[in-house]
Amino acid sequence: MMFTSESDLMRTIDWNEESNSVVLVDQTLLPQEYKVIECKTLSSLCEAIKSLRIRGAPALGAAGGFGIALAASLSGAKDLESMTRDLKVAAKALKSTRSTAVNLGWGVDRVLNAISDAFDVQGARDIALQEARDIAEEDIATNKLIGKYGTKFLKDGDSVLTHCNAGRLACVDWGTALGVVRSAIEEGKEIKVIACETRPLNQGSRITTWELMQDKIPVTLIADSMAGWAMHQGLVDSVLVGADRITQDVVFNKIGTYTHSILAKEHEIPFYVAAPISTFDFKGWEGSVKIEMRDPDELRFSGCQQLAPKDVEVYNPAFDATPMENVTAIITDKGVFYPPFLLDEVLV
């Protein structure tokens, strides 16, 4: 299915007023099928997060916010104290779905904190939904700012290598890393994207290439293992990725990002990270963050096809950690930060 304009694509995640439910693009079906699914219960939303129907740090922040709004809508509590208990249970369930992405918990906590201003149960429901909607709206504005600050790093005619998907489908709309590309193109620059497949779930080949092709942005798909050779051949002008969590010492992002950072450093190619301030974990460091481990069968199988012996031992972390010394700059909605990266400066 090819869409003819941006208006054909709904936001990655939104609220359906008529059914009081969360609606989202099921990214597990791409590129074969573009389908919007409805989450009418908290358990269905949690399943959507766990199974990566919705993924990407900023999108998960919105999912966390809408999740609390959904729980408030479904709660049968008669008083604020009972509702608060219900929402704390919902918050725990939402946060447990993905351990590494900081935005999910940030979105949950932001809506919970907003509800503290409520005077009654209906007021809490109204505040929760409005705060969740604010998170979604702010995400789009934030991504546009990231794009604005990042375009100076992309020259007319550049080829940009990216990993996983940090585009509109990783956010409510527009994108972080790919948002920088979109902003540069809006300025009239010709930019090409080299998308790494991003094994084992192939977010690069399934989602990034599909998304860019919808917007008619030139994209070339390569195997993950070819990135270094592409750099050696002079095909890559810069590497531009998103982030799932940024701590004092490292950038957590999709597995394979660390390898790209080493290859970029070896070939003297700039390595940029594009992420909102909400992705920063100001108190964390590499050793304090639990990296999510995925199902071993993601490596043993591709769909229904077996790729490896069923009983082979598998090590399948979802993320890796790129040290700050490998990062040229971090592009945020508050501006660009350069090494040495002092997170206290980000708070100013």
Swiss-Prot record:
Pfam families: IF-2B. The active site is at 244 (proton donor). GO terms for molecular function: S-methyl-5-thioribose-1-phosphate isomerase activity. SUPFAM superfamilies: NagB/RpiA/CoA transferase-like (SSF100950). Keywords: Amino-acid biosynthesis, Isomerase, Methionine biosynthesis. It catalyses: 5-(methylsulfanyl)-alpha-D-ribose 1-phosphate = 5-(methylsulfanyl)-D-ribulose 1-phosphate. The record marks 164 as: Transition state stabilizer. GO terms for biological process: L-methionine salvage from methylthioadenosine. It comes from the Archaea. InterPro entries: IF-2B-related, IF-M1Pi, IF_2B-like_C, Initiation_fac_2B_a/b/d, M1Pi_N, NagB/RpiA_transferase-like. Substrate binds at residues 55-57, 98, 203, 253-254. Belongs to the eIF-2B alpha/beta/delta subunits family. MtnA subfamily. PANTHER family: METHYLTHIORIBOSE-1-PHOSPHATE ISOMERASE. This is Putative methylthioribose-1-phosphate isomerase. It comes from Methanosarcina acetivorans (strain ATCC 35395 / DSM 2834 / JCM 12185 / C2A).
